[in-house]
């Protein structure tokens, strides 16, 4: 089975959650093969390791894999950044998706 680069979607925190001073970003990684994938979160270009929770890849019905990565921030942290990026590395290929908090409020 040939290698397949993942599709990456980055979801912003919900407005409901922000009211509670919480901000969870969800990076959805799907349709990749083989199953080994590395996720790196960046805020304003700097690597973030605190508050990161990444699932083990699971097999989809099409025999490719999917995983999710969550970044837990406070609403104030989220609003203080210019941009937040989910960087996914798979088989030497890197896919990046970014959000600008100012555009998501």
Curated annotation (Swiss-Prot):
List, for all copies, the residue spans of the domain called Ig-like: 6-100
The protein's matches in Pfam families, at most eight in alphabetical order, are given as: C1-set
* InterPro entries, per database record: Ig-like_dom, Ig-like_dom_sf, Ig-like_fold, Ig_C1-set, MHC/Immunoglobulin
Which SMART domains does the protein's record reference?
IGc1 (SM00407)
Q: Which UniProt keywords apply?
A: Disulfide bond, Immunoglobulin domain
Top-rank taxon: Eukaryota
PANTHER family, sorted: IG-LIKE DOMAIN-CONTAINING PROTEIN, MHC CLASS II-RELATED
What is the protein's given name?
Ig lambda chain C region
Q: Any extra detail in the entry?
A: This lambda chain expresses the c7 allotypic specificity.
Disulphides: 27-86
> What CDD domains does this protein's entry cite?
IgC1_L
SUPFAM superfamilies, A to Z: Immunoglobulin
């Amino acid at each position: 089975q040939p290698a397949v680069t993942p599709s990456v979607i980055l979801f912003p925190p919900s407005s409901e959650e922000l009211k509670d001073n919480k901000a969870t970003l969800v990076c959805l990684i799907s349709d990749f093969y083989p199953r080994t994938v590395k996720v790196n979160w960046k805020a304003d270009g700097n690597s973030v390791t605190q508050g990161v929770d990444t699932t083990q890849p699971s097999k989809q019905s099409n025999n490719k894999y999917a995983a999710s990565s969550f970044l837990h921030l406070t609403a104030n942290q989220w609003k203080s950044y210019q941009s937040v990026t989910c960087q996914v590395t798979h088989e030497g290929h890197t896919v990046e998706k970014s959000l600008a908090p100012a555009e998501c409020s």
